Regions:
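Activation on beta-sandwich/Ig-like modules and their edge loops
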Residues: 20-167, 172-179, 191
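Disulfide-bonded cysteine-rich modules in secreted/extracellular proteins
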Residues: 1, 189-193
């Protein structure tokens, strides 16, 4: 039997009791890969778009009620969680990506009809309480790698020790279509700050 913490809180509140829940701050959930403009070699552009989250913690983290609220939108559901030091993939069309991903990687689709902007935009991840967990403002120029802009590679965060809000911390994946749900191909090639 699984007991949901929020159900217990609701029950306590119903009977006039109260308690305070202090949830850990998960600064270690990061946007780690963006495939915003796939190559036509893969097929239809929007079928292969994805975002990847990476959990730097040594324990699984529930994404229940976390959200993506700019770029694309998605509110995560109760079953959505990221394994310890693992990945979570958010896709435009999961059917396409499932052919590339390791079979055990958790995933979901973002809201229907949306796609990532091919020239750049802000991608925002928010915790369940609305606080900012991570944000990346990517572009296809101004210091950002240009190969991920329709040439096949994804945009990969180069190292978990680098600030992922900086263009210099991102590079082009070495593989067509990137590495959804797996370690980034560029990891270990740059010195963390």
């Amino acid at each position: 039997m699984t007991v949901n913490l929020y159900d217990i809180l609701l029950l306590l509140t119903h009977y006039g009791d109260s308690c305070t829940v202090v949830e850990p701050v998960h600064a270690s959930i990061q946007i780690s890969e963006i495939h915003y403009n796939p190559s036509s070699l893969q097929g239809n552009d929007s079928d292969w778009e994805f975002l990847e989250l990476h959990n730097l913690e040594t324990h699984a983290v529930s994404l229940f009620n976390w959200s993506m609220d700019s770029g694309v939108t998605k509110t995560f559901e109760e079953q959505d969680s990221i394994p310890a030091q693992g990945f979570f993939v958010i896709a435009r069309n999961a059917d396409s990506l499932l052919t590339m991903m390791p079979p055990t990687v958790p995933w979901c689709e973002w809201n229907s009809g949306q796609s990532l902007n091919n020239t750049g935009e802000t991608i925002t991840l928010r915790r369940w309480d609305g606080s900012l967990a991570d944000q990346v403002i990517y572009e296809d120029s101004d210091g950002w790698m240009t190969a991920p802009d329709g040439m096949g590679p994804s945009l990969e965060w180069m190292d978990t020790g680098l600030p992922n809000e900086s263009a210099s911390s991102w590079g082009a994946s070495f593989t067509l279509g990137g590495t959804p749900g797996a370690s980034n191909s560029m990891w270990g090639l740059s010195e963390p700050e």
